[in-house]
């Protein structure tokens, strides 16, 4: 949780679950959600090499990685996409949100297109057992081809478009929105992280 006195994040107490968050423009509130989930969180710059993260994973220093939200066109972030491909190949548990959601899809070989008619704001999102209101601010949409490699776990109620995914045969989850700590997405990611 953010500590206003020190200007830093407090580490989760007695946490044996550590994750690195790749910062593409991460929100403090989302980092707080990860800490509330019981993770010790280390934020690393977007320029961090996948080999460093993979070595930390193999050494047992971290149990997973989070690809954060942020601004910009995911299609032009070719260096980041190449690094994420290596993370995918390492089988490290990945949670991707916002911009990270699109980058993970691109790294998995699926096309991401700009939406012609953008609708920002609060949207009802239907999961397996719940309907939640979430803030959607994405200008992009993942191709329907994603269904060949991922299961859709959450959709927008208004238009049935996919907004959260679980990749098949992988330890990878992603969502267009920032999930809260008690959401099924975060709970499943917590189970993946050792």
PLM feature spans:
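Residues that mark the start of a beta-strand
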Residues: 18-20, 40, 93, 133, ...
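Generic structural signal for residues in well-ordered beta-strands
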Residues: 41-43, 112, 152
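Conserved hydrophobic/aromatic beta-strand scaffold that supports enzyme active sites
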Residues: 122-124, 164, 174
């Amino acid at each position: 949780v953010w500590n206003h006195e020190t200007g830093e994040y407090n580490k989760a107490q007695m946490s044996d679950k550590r994750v690195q968050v790749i910062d593409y423009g991460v929100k403090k509130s989302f980092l707080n959600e990860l800490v509330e989930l019981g993770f010790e969180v280390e934020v690393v710059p977007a320029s961090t090499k996948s080999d460093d993260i993979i070595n930390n994973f193999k050494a047992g220093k971290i149990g997973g990685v989070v690809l954060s939200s942020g601004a910009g066109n995911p299609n032009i972030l070719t260096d980041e996409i190449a690094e994420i491909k290596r993370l995918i190949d390492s089988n490290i548990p990945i949670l991707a949100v916002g911009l990270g959601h699109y980058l993970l899809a691109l790294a998995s070989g699926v096309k991401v297109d700009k939406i012609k008619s953008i609708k920002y704001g609060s949207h009802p999102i239907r999961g397996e057992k719940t309907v939640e209101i979430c803030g959607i601010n994405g200008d992009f949409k993942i191709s329907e081809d994603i269904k060949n490699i991922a299961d859709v776990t959450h959709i927008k109620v208004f238009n049935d478009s996919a907004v959260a995914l679980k990749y098949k045969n992988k330890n990878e989850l992603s969502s267009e929105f920032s999930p809260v700590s008690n959401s099924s997405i975060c709970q499943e990611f917590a189970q993946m992280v050792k």
